[in-house]
Amino acid sequence: MRLLDEPVNLLLSIPALLWAISFHEFCHGFAAKMVGDPTAERQGRLSLNPLAHFDLVGTLMLLFVGFGWAKPVPINTRYFRHPRRDIVIVSLAGVAGNLLTATLTVFFLRFFGRAWVSLTGEPGFAVLWHMIRINLGLAAFNLIPIPPLDGSRVIEAFLPYKYLYHYRWLEQYGMFILLVLVASGIINLFFDPIFNALWRLTMWQLLSIGS
């Protein structure tokens, strides 16, 4: 999933990269607002502007490694009426946004792909291909249950209360653990199965729709 294999490939991936990051965080903020938390909106993060969600390290990771993250949308669980349920909704909203984008791109490619390619050529096809790959990559990466990724919030919501203290203690080291796993390549043991499952499902949609 590396994007820096060639300069042209990098340039063609930029629209998908900006959209995937922006929409992912927007969905978090929108879901939080729907369950009662106005924090993201008040801080100007309920936006599709990539600059509102830009994280230098996470973006460089996306470019050089193939997966990464944006600046997390601020969430205040004190506003949640049903904290455990609502944190799952908010945490999975970003992933859902990326999967929705990938699915809609597949639909577009399936029904309008020939016309699109005839108008835009190989670069136009590459833009759509990156839109699918990057959104699936961001979704898969965020499903990994390691703090501070979205998957960890889902795990936290289902943990018995007696384990929450220990899990939240681990969170303060989450970013360090994550970077070590990425640098060592161990992260692929988590990432690859999730991404491959999402990729196979997406390709099945592409091949089966309208057949």
What are these regions (language model features)?
Residues 1-211:
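Hydrophobic transmembrane alpha-helices and their immediate loop junctions
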